Swiss-Prot record:
The protein, known as: Membrane-bound O-acyltransferase GUP1
Top-level taxonomic group: Eukaryota
Function comment: Membrane-bound O-acyltransferase involved in the remodeling of glycosylphosphatidylinositol (GPI) anchors. Acts only on GPI-anchored proteins, but not on free GPI lipids. Also involved in lipid metabolism, having profound effects on sphingolipid-sterol-ordered domains integrity and assembly. Involved in cell integrity and apoptosis.
Lineage per the UniProt record: Eukaryota, Fungi, Dikarya, Ascomycota, Saccharomycotina
This protein's UniProt keywords: Cell membrane, Endoplasmic reticulum, Membrane, Mitochondrion, Transmembrane, Transmembrane helix
Predominant localisation class: membrane
UniProt topological domain (Extracellular) ranges: 1-217, 288-296, 452-464
Organism: Millerozyma farinosa (Yeast)
Length: 505
């Protein structure tokens, strides 16, 4: 598999001149590096600056803790986060919308469907912010100096900041609305800062942590939406969870320094894997130039597969850096990628493991309010994946990707309903493996279409698979390989269950 991807993208391939201009000088064994992905290039080229920012933030935090002693963390987060917020994002209007939003939201409580009003206001704010930023972008004199350094480490564009802020603003205000609707003050915990008597809530319980109503204030609001370690790219943490960990009960996991060090080693290993892939197979450059003419179906499939793996890694690495930063800072956010993308056979489970914190946010604030998995499950899923597509970018291609994912979920839901009464039959596992093979192919095609090869590349792959002898041979061989691989994945999950681990994906 590695060799096929290398043969399709290295110097020996006849299509090499078409994408050679996208390659840069590398550092591994004298080879060039495929640094053509814009998002990851910004992260990779400015990695030392990001590390400097982590060191600066951590040093300031430790210094303030020594000087101020027992104080609320959110005060420091408010000051540091607000500076990063004002100086790093190219969306000049976003800070004003954040402040305006806080002033307007209290009045929404007088509206009968205040949750709908909140969502409508935040979505409209995000869209208006995008419009103003694109048409009236400016750069004030006072922050030009800061931007010359800080903006370099901010690899997301204005849209991503607006939609990310949309998610944070919704979390704060929907948590606030839920709190106002909840029972009397007697339901509150007797929370005291740094109280050792408090029991440690798990990650699900912290979503609805009984935070006092007085904690829903402007300082906490701004501290939350501009919390530096998670500001640039996440993972996403809810307002209740953030305040609970910041001001009431630090998780024991952030005090386990051995665990944090092992997490750092895993992060470093992921970077080395990514560097190896970028130096030895130039699949991103090939996909950008559509330089796959004459490649075999096997090579086309491997171009697509390793493209997806690089997309997975380019998201995993920043998320793990920012989560590592947050762990060092004393906040334990969710892990966004809890499985390798190649270790998935279920469409539903795949999305639980991919961008897990965002998946939880979607379920809590969108999917469940829409009705969840009831009789309108398919329609609710369509709404959710449409939102996810727009969250990535406003493109018809991504909307179609979201709708394809929903269509591909339907067979799995149907098969699960039909065969759920036969789980103890000896043939059940093999039927599941056949379904897994179909799922894997459908997930690959949907993601190749949306993020890698586009319409032309995906159609070219499908055409060669079904209209050529070599394509049909590869198709049937790959089906057999995926069938065996699915059995291995089943057994890996059974081994996890025997150890008491069940991550539901």
């Amino acid at each position: 598999m590695f060799k096929a991807a290398m043969d399709a993208s290295n110097e020996t391939n006849p299509n090499y001149p078409k994408f050679a201009h996208l390659l840069s000088q590398g550092w591994m064994f004298g080879r060039k590096v495929d640094n053509s992905d814009q998002q990851y290039r910004f992260f990779r080229d400015n990695f030392p600056l990001l590390c400097g920012l982590v060191l600066l933030h951590t040093s300031l935090r430790r210094g303030v803790n020594l000087i101020a002693g027992n104080h609320k963390r959110t005060g420091f987060d408010f000051v540091f986060g607000x500076d990063i917020h004002l100086c790093s994002t190219r969306d000049e209007f976003l800070p004003y919308f954040d402040s305006l939003g806080y002033x307007i939201f209290p009045f929404l409580k007088y509206i009968k469907r205040n949750d709908v009003a909140t969502x409508t206001y935040v979505d409209x704010t995000a869209i208006l912010s995008l419009f103003l930023n694109d048409n009236y972008x400016s750069c004030t004199i006072w922050n030009r100096f800061y931007r010359s350094w800080i903006s370099e480490v901010s690899f997301q564009d204005g849209m991503c900041f607006s939609i990310s802020h949309c998610x944070r603003m919704l979390s704060y205000n929907l948590d606030y609305i839920e709190k106002r609707k909840s029972a009397s003050e007697e339901s509150n915990l007797e929370l005291k800062n740094s109280s050792s008597s408090l029991s440690e809530l798990d990650d699900r319980e912290r979503l609805v942590a009984p935070i006092p109503l007085t904690d829903y204030n402007f300082v906490n609001y701004m501290a939350y939406i501009t919390y530096a370690p998670l500001f640039i790219a996440g993972p996403i943490i809810t307002f209740n969870d953030y305040i609970y960990q910041s001001d009431y009960k630090a998780m024991s996991s952030v005090k386990d320094y051995k665990r944090t060090f092992i997490y750092f080693l895993r992060f470093a290993f992921c970077i080395l894997v990514m560097e190896f892939l970028l130096h030895f197979m130039y699949v991103v450059a090939v996909s950008k130039t559509k330089a796959w003419e004459g490649d075999t179906p096997f090579q086309l499939s491997m171009l697509g597969l390793f493209n997806l793996n690089i997309i997975w890694l380019k998201l995993l690495i920043p998320w793990r850096l920012f989560r590592l930063w947050s762990l060092i800072d004393g906040i334990d956010p969710p892990e966004n990628m809890i499985r390798c993308m190649d270790n998935n056979f279920s469409t539903l489970a795949f999305w639980r493991a991919w961008h897990r914190s965002y998946n939880r946010w979607i379920i809590r604030y969108i999917y469940i309010p829409l009705g969840g998995g009831g009789k309108y499950r398919i329609l609710n899923s369509l709404c959710v994946f449409s939102f996810v597509a727009i969250w990535h970018d406003i493109e018809l291609k991504l909307l179609m990707w979201g709708w394809l994912v929903v269509i591909f979920i339907i067979p799995e839901l149907a098969a699960t309903a039909i065969f759920k009464n036969y789980q103890h039959e000896p043939w059940y596992r093999h039927v599941c493996a056949l379904g897994a093979v179909i799922n894997i192919w459908m997930m690959m095609l949907a993601n190749l279409f949306g993020f890698c090869m586009g319409k032309d590349g995906t159609m070219s792959l499908i055409k060669t698979l079904f209209t050529t002898a070599v394509g049909l041979r590869f198709l049937f061989l790959s089906l057999g390989a995926l069938f065996v691989g699915s059995q291995v994945m089943f057994e890996l999950r059974e081994a996890e269950k025997r150890r008491g681990v069940n991550v539901k994906c």
